[in-house]
């Protein structure tokens, strides 16, 4: 029942799947040089360094990888980002298709709907086969202090060739098990901790690192809840800190060299100052939801206060996000600027692209919330079938005049995050998001169009409270 309804209700919201025949036409010219191709003599050879990638299980669109190595008694840290724009000519039909799709879509328990055709993805992804492959990358390179593990001296941005092989591609689980054995992982954790501590001086947003929610996984018997181990959480936080470091540097680089780009912003400094210093990650997440704090895409420079950076962009996921591709073209323009290249985007074009990225991202957030809701209802149904009852925890976040907005935060002993809303007229009771209520549930109905009656006992508990 749930899988059939998912195919009918949720999956279509992710849009049109890729068409192999059409993709063959789109990728006819991907091996041809174009205006923003980087010649081999301008690429730095980093194929001699071990390069590692850590991604979710089943990932084949690895945007990022890293190397940690010692040279001349100095410790270096390199973040390598895939370079798909090497194969994409601006204003081509391939580029138009990427702009139209804007992001890769990830329907649950289904294959992704990639933003890029498979040929470009395979050429760009920083994963290799068992023999290894040379891939093109844009690398952020910095020296690291051997004692504090903080980045020191000048940070460089390089166009590179890197060597990637399957043996160095890990899942978060695999990496968490081997982190003490692989020196690059061990040092990487220390570098990420130093980056986090530096950010903590500028934002309470680092408290979000504490938040860990269970999520559905799937096997032949259906959907089940899984909670990351401590080691998996540490590995995810490490990769996230690497991305924040790179995105912040590129944001600053674009500001200094162009004062234009597509920036990820969140104006929340004043609001963050109102929060007490001892706030937990879960409390902060609850406050963010209740107060409607969210990030924007903008073509002008503003700070991202939740991550604690005065300049911030999305640069590290170009295989799956249009915004990152745009940053890559701008970086290449800066590289070629001395050759009197024309700028790839006008101010008005950047503004339109930023608006598109924002609208598509927000629309997809709604689809993801629906997807999560649907799958968590499926999990609840399975748990009730096996055990007759479950316990859920919930709190009310607000009332719009027609809809009462609720967050389900616990299913049995698992922390979850599931939005739920009820159509209610003239709701006049006090709303306190800190008041979490727990109820026993014996019935869950498959989601159709509205949340109402999917968890009947929850509806009854809220309306009679």
What do the predicted segments below correspond to?
Residues 1-26:
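Boundary/activation segment at the start of structured domains
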Residues 2-6, 27-464:
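Electropositive polyanion-binding surfaces
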């Amino acid at each position: 029942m749930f899988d059939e309804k998912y195919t009918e209700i949720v999956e279509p919201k992710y849009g049109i799947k890729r068409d192999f025949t059409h993709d063959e036409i789109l990728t006819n010219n991907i091996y041809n040089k174009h205006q923003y191709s980087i010649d081999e003599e301008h690429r730095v050879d980093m194929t001699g360094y071990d390069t590692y990638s850590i991604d979710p299980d089943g990932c084949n669109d690895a945007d990022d990888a890293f190397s940690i190595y010692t040279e001349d008694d100095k410790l270096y840290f390199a973040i390598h980002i895939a370079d798909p724009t090497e194969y994409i000519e601006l204003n081509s039909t391939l580029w138009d298709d990427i702009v139209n799709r804007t992001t890769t879509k990830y329907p649950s328990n289904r294959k992704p709907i990639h933003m890029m055709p498979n040929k470009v993805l395979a050429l760009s992804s920083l994963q290799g086969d068992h023999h290894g492959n040379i891939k093109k990358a844009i690398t952020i390179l910095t020296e690291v202090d051997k004692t504090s593990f903080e980045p020191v001296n000048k940070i460089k941005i390089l166009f590179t060739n890197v060597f990637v092989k399957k043996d160095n591609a890990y899942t978060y689980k695999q990496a968490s098990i081997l982190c003490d054995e692989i020196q690059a992982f061990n040092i990487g954790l220390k570098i990420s901790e130093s980056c986090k501590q530096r950010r903590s001086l500028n934002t309470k947003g680092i408290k979000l690192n504490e938040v860990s929610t269970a999520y559905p996984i799937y096997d032949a018997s259906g959907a089940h809840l899984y909670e990351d181990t401590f080691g998996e959480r540490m590995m995810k936080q490490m990769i996230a800190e690497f991305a924040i470091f790179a995105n912040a540097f590129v944001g600053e680089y674009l500001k200094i060299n162009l004062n234009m780009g597509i920036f990820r912003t969140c104006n929340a400094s004043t609001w963050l100052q109102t929060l007490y210093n001892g706030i937990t990650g879960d409390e902060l997440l609850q406050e963010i939801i209740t107060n409607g704090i969210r990030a924007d895409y903008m073509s002008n420079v503003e700070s991202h206060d939740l991550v604690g950076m005065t300049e911030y962009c999305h640069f590290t996921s170009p295989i799956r996000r249009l915004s990152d591709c745009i940053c890559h073209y701008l970086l290449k323009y800066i590289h070629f600027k001395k050759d009197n290249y024309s700028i790839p985007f006008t101010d008005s074009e950047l503004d339109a692209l930023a608006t598109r990225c924002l609208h598509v991202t927000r629309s997809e957030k709604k689809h993801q919330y629906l997807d999560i809701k649907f799958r968590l209802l499926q999990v609840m149904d399975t748990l009730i079938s096996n055990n007759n009852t479950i316990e859920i925890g919930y709190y009310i976040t607000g009332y719009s005049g027609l809809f009462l907005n609720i967050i389900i935060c616990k299913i049995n002993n698992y922390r979850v995050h599931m939005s739920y809303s009820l159509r209610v007229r003239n709701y006049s009771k006090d709303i306190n998001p800190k008041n979490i209520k727990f109820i026993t549930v014996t019935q869950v109905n498959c989601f159709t169009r509205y949340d109402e009656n999917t968890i009947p006992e929850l509806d009854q508990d809220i309306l009679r409270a």
